[in-house]
Amino acid sequence: MVITVDGPSGAGKGTLCYALAKKLGFSLLDSGAIYRVTALAALKTQEQGQSAVKLDDEFALAELARKLDIQFLPQNGEVQIFLDGENVSGQIRTQDVADAASKVAVFPAVRSALLQLQQDFAKQGKGLIADGRDMGTVVFPNAQVKLFLDASAEERAKRRYKQLQSKGIDGNFAQILAEIKERDFRDRNRLVAPLKPADDALLLDSTELSIEDVIAQALAYIESKTA
């Protein structure tokens, strides 16, 4: 069984998906992390200076994507992400990598290279929670349950700002908001697999909801679809 959760950055997909996976005993696929790992791998080649893969080189990026060794492993109550055996969970959450991932994700060849990798996750375990931008529309169009989680750009910027503050990192709210709006525009207007709800997805707006409310509504919907 596959449950897809799509939506823009900062809407709360990661928290919701982890809660659903834990509650239902399903595996978790964070497709955004896969694109971030691809971007990180490209940035690492640039740092090493050998066979550097540029972020505007679609086919070099696609070739790199096909060779990625990515694992999602639960550790200490969180899902840790490994690239070639190295835990890169922290590295892929930086703003530089996030921006690079959004640029990498616009290329059809890269999306095609990563499509099979993502679909293979559905073959593991009794079920899969798939977190992303096009899980319900492209990667798993026949998923039994589809959710689309959204929130206003302002609310998502507030959450990101508070998250940075909690980590002792200075953040500029206006800059964060501008970056979110720019990323939204790229994601919603790319030619291949643009960010949009599947026709048969439940729309959840988390702007005014607590995460507990979002989880409760999602679980109730899943139960209604699988009863």
From Swiss-Prot:
Extract the CDD domains matched here. CMPK
Q: Does the keyword Membrane apply?
A: no
The residues that the entry says bind ATP are 7-15
Reaction catalysed by this enzyme: CMP + ATP = CDP + ADP; dCMP + ATP = dCDP + ADP
Output one GO BP term: nucleobase-containing small molecule interconversion
Task: Please name the GO terms that the record assigns under molecular function.
Answer: ATP binding; CMP kinase activity; dCMP kinase activity
- KW Nucleotide-binding (keyword) present: yes
Q: What is its EC number?
A: 2.7.4.25
Gene3D superfamilies noted in UniProt = P-loop containing nucleotide triphosphate hydrolases
InterPro entries per UniProt: Cytidylate_kin, Cytidylate_kinase_dom, P-loop_NTPase
Family, according to the entry, reads as follows: Belongs to the cytidylate kinase family. Type 1 subfamily.
The record's annotation in NCBIfam families points to:
cmk
Q: What is the designated name of this protein?
A: Cytidylate kinase
Originating species: Actinobacillus succinogenes (strain ATCC 55618 / DSM 22257 / CCUG 43843 / 130Z)
